[in-house]
Amino acid sequence: MNGLENKYIIKNNKRLRYGYTTGSCAAGAASGAVRMLLSGRELSEVTLPTPKGITLTLALHDITRGDNYVSCAVRKDAGDDPDTTNGILVYVKAEKICCRDSETDNCEDIGTGASRPQIILDGGIGVGRVTKPGLSQKIGEAAINPVPRAMILKEAEEAALSLIHI
């Protein structure tokens, strides 16, 4: 059950099943990875709202833990849309990073003492890079469109805020 079981659109007199976007998959995986990283618990699914007001429940797959990271994936379901990304696993890796204190060489978690967690978003395998001006991101940044970028950052930040006291 993902929240879309009874959602359809009629197009050319055909009833087409709703699906969800790659951005929703990435946002769900980000939420799951951050929650598992900070809580130490295993999750099987996450719930998130879409920009259209639909609440999705997304299963988490291929969970991997390391010393300071958790990665997981959400499987894309494009519904009846002929999307070439249908069925792929969209991965996110959440990692604790630190800043070295120049005097003590101690590693301090980023976000300590800050009013909000500091979240750095970058693309991984399969995500292109901006190479020319004209997109909403700077040259060299991951080519993640504004709405999915905002969704990913929102879900990661909300997950972090729900589990840490800054």
Each model region followed by its residue ranges:
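Translation machinery proteins
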Residues: 44-81
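Acidic-glycine-rich active-site phosphate/pyrophosphate-binding loop
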Residues: 1-9
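Short, basic and Ser/Thr-rich N-terminal targeting/leader segments
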Residues: 42, 54, 86-88
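A generic, well-ordered mixed alpha/beta core segment in the N-terminal half of proteins
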Residues: 68-99, 108-161
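Conserved small/polar residues in nucleotide/adenosyl-binding loops
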Residues: 164-166
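Alpha/propeptide regions of enzymes that mature by internal proteolysis
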Residues: 10-48, 116, 136-162
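Short, glycine/acidic-enriched capping/hinge loops at junctions between secondary-structure elements
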Residues: 40-41, 58-60, 84, 132-134
